[in-house]
Regions:
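A generic transmembrane alpha-helix motif of multi-pass inner-membrane proteins
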Residues: 167, 367-433
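Hydrophobic alpha-helical segments and their helix-loop junctions in multi-pass secondary transporters
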Residues: 91-95, 154-180, 198-199, 247-250, ...
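TM-loop-TM module centered on a large, flexible mid-protein loop between adjacent transmembrane helices
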Residues: 67-73, 241-291, 342
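Hydrophobic transmembrane alpha-helices that form the core helical bundles
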Residues: 29, 78-112, 287-307
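Selective recognition of specific alpha-helical transmembrane segments in multi-pass small-molecule
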Residues: 51, 55, 152-164, 198-200, ...
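Membrane-water interface regions at transmembrane-helix termini and the short interhelical loops
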Residues: 61-68, 128-149, 214-217, 327-339, ...
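Hydrophobic, membrane-embedded alpha-helices of multi-pass small-molecule transporters
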Residues: 9-19, 127, 163-170, 179-245, ...
Length: 433
């Protein structure tokens, strides 16, 4: 029997797994640039940064694991996608980024020790060892994250968000050019990509499925019902938080001059509101957010590679990813963010279309035809976006892509992918006849 308390704990765990430090960093900057359009921009951000990951989480939880999304692709394509997915959200990009965000926003502002490469390494080692201790006992993940870490994190965030609405630092600023010249909703939609939460949901769905299985809940209908119930808790909390952080950014003109990222806005804002105590408050928020996400992401990656390799156990991969994360994090946050974006532009649209295809799969007359054609088209367009980001796309290709709807909004792949999906459905029906 899954009680209301169990649903609450699971919902809090889902909230904590999705709420990484990066999710706290991005909204303030977007709110600052959106200015008077902050609410509309926040709505767009919530659609891609909260609602879409929630839908993905439910789908994957019912399937049992993220790998089921790719079962209709050729084996080589399935392995390539999943390996890329877990590398992006794992020890190559996201996990080292989490470590660096925790160091730069939770440790350095306290001025306990000097900001040196040696101290960075010491922090990275200690921080990742703490996370590893949680992961080596996977049965404690739902209880430790859902019962202890999340409530503490939530209390700290409530203190900040309530204070922001009661005592904003500045009047709401005018929108920047990027928000003034285009739809704030669309710009917010694209900004929501930065959370990488659709990718994370593919990994986290397996964690939720295992948590429910531990309670003897294995029937698809029950899994869906409890995942939706628990997930709604996460959706409400994340949406409320993002709207609050967008408002924080929109009213941050007093402290936002000369900043380069939302983390600096958040840090300065909190310090002005709460003084020296604000540094400790912010450090607590960032540290807990980073730790909970690191535990969830690394655990999901370790489970996947343990299944893929068969002979090497989960604990081995936890140690491997912990060591890799510690080493790669020494490259610094700025460099990691630069190399993450091209990979994200390539894989994110593919992940979205795999979820969309799952909804229509039962009605497809020729499953493999639709899957292969749709994903192939999506990859072609997303690859162009990735190459364009690193300056390797030719002017001719840019001009060609400019003819497609939503190109200026970074969504040139969407219409062709959907068109091919529906076209292959019609072709499949004719073949069946």
């Amino acid at each position: 029997m899954f009680s209301r308390k169990d649903i609450l704990v699971l919902g809090m765990m889902i909230f904590a797994l999705f709420l990484g430090a990066g999710n706290i960093i991005f909204p303030p900057m977007e709110g600052y640039t959106a200015g008077q359009h902050w609410a509309t921009a926040a709505l767009g951000f919530v659609l891609t940064g909260v609602l879409m990951p929630f839908i993905t989480l439910v789908v994957v939880s019912v399937l049992g694991r993220g790998e089921e999304l790719t079962r209709d692709l050729p084996k080589w394509a399935e392995v390539l996608f999943l390996a890329t997915l877990y590398l992006v959200i794992g020890s190559t990009f996201a996990m080292p980024r989490i470590t660096n965000v925790a160091y730069e926003m939770a440790f350095v502002p306290l001025d306990i020790v000097a900001d040196t490469s040696r101290n960075h390494l010491i922090f990275a080692v200690v921080f990742n060892i703490i996370a590893m201790l949680f992961m080596l006992k996977p049965n404690t993940i739902i209880s430790s994250v859902g019962k202890f870490m999340t409530p503490a994190l939530l209390v700290l965030l409530v203190v900040v968000t309530v204070t922001v609405f009661i005592s904003p630092l500045s009047d709401i600023v005018a929108p920047s050019k990027s928000y003034a010249d285009s739809s704030a909703l669309t710009t917010g939609l694209i900004s929501g990509y930065q959370t990488m939460d659709v990718l994370a949901a593919i990994a986290f769905g397996g964690i939720v499925a295992r948590a429910l299985s531990a309670k003897n809940i294995t029937e698809p209908q029950k899994i869906m019902r409890y995942t939706i119930s628990a997930g709604c808790i996460s959706v409400v909390l994340l949406a409320a938080l993002y709207f609050s952080l967008f408002y924080l950014g929109a009213t941050s003109d007093q402290v936002a001059q000369g900043v380069s990222n939302g983390g600096q806005i958040f840090s300065r804002y909190v310090n002005v509101l709460f003084g020296k105590e604000g540094s400790w408050l912010m450090s607590g928020i960032i540290f807990l957010a980073s730790l909970t996400t690191l535990v969830g992401v690394t655990s999901a990656c370790a489970y996947y590679f343990a299944k893929f390799s068969n002979r090497l156990p989960y604990s081995f991969w936890v140690v491997v990813f912990t060591v890799m994360t510690t080493i790669i994090s020494e490259n610094g946050l700025t460099k990691l963010l630069q190399v993450t974006i091209p990979a994200l532009l390539l894989i994110y649209p593919v992940a979205i279309m795999l979820v969309v295809l799952q909804f229509v799969r039962a009605k497809l007359p020729c499953v493999k035809l639709t899957y292969n054609a749709t994903i192939a088209v999506t990859v072609c367009f997303s690859l162009c976006d990735s190459l364009n980001n690193v300056g390797l796309l030719s002017d001719g290709m840019k001009q060609f892509l400019g003819n497609f709807p939503l190109y200026d909004n970074g969504l040139a792949w969407l219409v062709p992918a959907l068109a091919v999906m529906f076209l292959t459905m019609l072709v499949g029906k004719k073949r069946a006849v």
